């Protein structure tokens, strides 16, 4: 089952978020992570969704709204997607992505956009299998801003 996360899900969502951070080589920082998630849950712009197996949260995703100003339509950015190691290979990521697409469509979105690490071949395989295509039209740049 997949449903929108609420503040009541903070413990489970934080646990998965910490595991996600560790997967990408970041420190766990449990207290900071929980505060970060709680702040995001209280904001109304982004959406967290949890995948459940009974009472256990086994995956999460975080969607952020944006706009395609050329098409003058909303888009959603899949900022985070993580499935617990114990639940991988069971279709959880596919179910989360399907839910994300249905949610985005319900808002009139033009597209769902995501990014993944170059070496995350398992995720790339899933995305390609589900019809996601690599963006070659634009180059994306970023600049880190020091506090």
Task: Specify the residue positions occupied by each region the protein language model found.
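Acetyl-CoA-dependent GNAT
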Residues: 4-73, 79, 97-99, 103, ...
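Conserved beta-strand-loop-alpha-helix junction that forms the acyl-donor binding cleft
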Residues: 88, 110-123, 142-145
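Conserved active-site alpha-helix within GNAT-family acetyltransferase domains
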Residues: 94, 118-137, 143
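Conserved GNAT acetyl-CoA-binding A-motif
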Residues: 97, 104-115
């Amino acid at each position: 089952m997949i449903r929108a996360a609420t503040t009541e899900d903070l413990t489970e969502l934080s646990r998965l978020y910490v595991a996600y951070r560790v997967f990408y080589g970041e420190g766990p920082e449990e207290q900071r992570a929980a505060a970060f998630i709680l702040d995001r849950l209280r904001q109304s712009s982004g959406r967290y969704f949890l995948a459940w197996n009974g009472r256990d949260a086994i995956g999460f995703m975080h969607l952020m709204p944006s706009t395609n100003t050329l098409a003058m339509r909303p888009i959603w950015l899949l900022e985070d997607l993580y499935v617990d190691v114990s639940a991988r290979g069971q279709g959880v990521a596919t179910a989360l992505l399907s839910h994300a697409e249905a949610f985005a469509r319900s808002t009139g979105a033009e597209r769902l956009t995501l990014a993944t690490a170059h070496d995350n071949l398992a995720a790339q395989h899933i995305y390609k299998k589900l019809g996601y295509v690599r963006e070659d039209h634009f180059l994306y740049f970023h600049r880190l801003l020091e506090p």
